[in-house]
Swiss-Prot record:
Subcellular location, principal: membrane
CDD domains xrefs: HAMP (cd06225), HATPase (cd00075), HisKA (cd00082)
Function: Member of the two-component regulatory system GtcS/GtcR which may act in the control of the transcription of the grs operon which encodes the multienzymes involved in the biosynthesis of the peptide antibiotic gramicidin S. Probably activates GtcR by phosphorylation.
GO cellular component, one term: plasma membrane
Name by which UniProt lists this protein: Sensor protein GtcS
Lineage: Bacteria, Bacillati, Bacillota, Bacilli, Bacillales
Catalytic reaction equation(s): ATP + protein L-histidine = ADP + protein N-phospho-L-histidine
Amino acid sequence: MITAYILFTVTVGVTNSIVFYLDDHIGTRHFKKRVYCSSAWIVAWRLMEMVIFALSVYLYSRWTSKRITGPLEKITDAIQKMREGEFAQRLCFKADYELTLIQEHFNEMVAHLEKTEAEKNKLEQSKQRMLLDLSHDFKTPITTIQGYAMALQMGVVDSPEKQRRYLEMIYNKSIIVTALVEDMFQLATLDSPDLPSAEEHGRFGRTGSEIAIAYFDQFEQNKFSLDLKIPTQRVMIRMNRNLLYRALSNLLSNTLKHNPKGTKVALSLTDTHEAILLEVMDNGIGIAEELKESIFQPFVRGDKARTGEGTGLGLPSPKKRLNFMVESCCSRVNQGKQYSRSFSQRLENDLPYRLPYHRMNKFHRNANQQ
């Protein structure tokens, strides 16, 4: 019979020593034997554990570098490029949720900054073009005034008829300069944050009808046809009546000024139960497709030739006035012929109700007969 006893275990560093006491009973023969077993296999196992641990640390470091440090370096590089004014850089990496969220927000921010920078550059170019065009518009009538005034001062014009005509030309050119200054002042006033809105709930259709009636005689004289499409219901909306009146007046005045005789004009008001749509259309000379987006900017003209008597501020003025009241403003061109300007305002619990247009019956009949 063999009996084994574990006496003690000693750990020194990575070496374990186990002492066994063996008691053998074989017949009459008794002997005791101590066996000291040095666990070399435990040392080898511990060394293997250390190698595996070191390899795991290395692999984890590489994984961490790829999943965390790598994206952070890309974010840092993108921020540096954005700081230098390069907004075309976009982040694109695979990472954990938090870094992916940072990537999405960063790309959105860069896209917004890129758009803002493009608009800023476009505005700077527009200002430079506006200054050049403004100097041209001032220079032409002022030069004419100086020439006629100098001729009168030097006594070159002897005929009373010519003197009268020269004075009339000076007066007409001064009116153009005054109109230009007035338009510039109006644009500056509309850009001012201190401009009082003076909004009230008014009849959108009624104001449009009054404008159409005011221009009806001029339309007849120029053989223009006017189609007025206003619903028989009264729609109450938020508006500044003076700004709306002047904006529509600018649009109709531009239509008369820049289109040939026989042009058909339509002024329509549509209630979609969600928004009010005001549209001014004509089938006149139209505008080029490339000017569709910039036609509301100052000094942008459809004919690109600054030979007319207008100031070039016709469309920006009504757009700025209507921006105080409308949700959106746009223009459309149909094959370069039909041109329309659309303005819409969202309704705010203002349900339309009936309005008898007694004054408009005769006007509707006259407009439809043309």
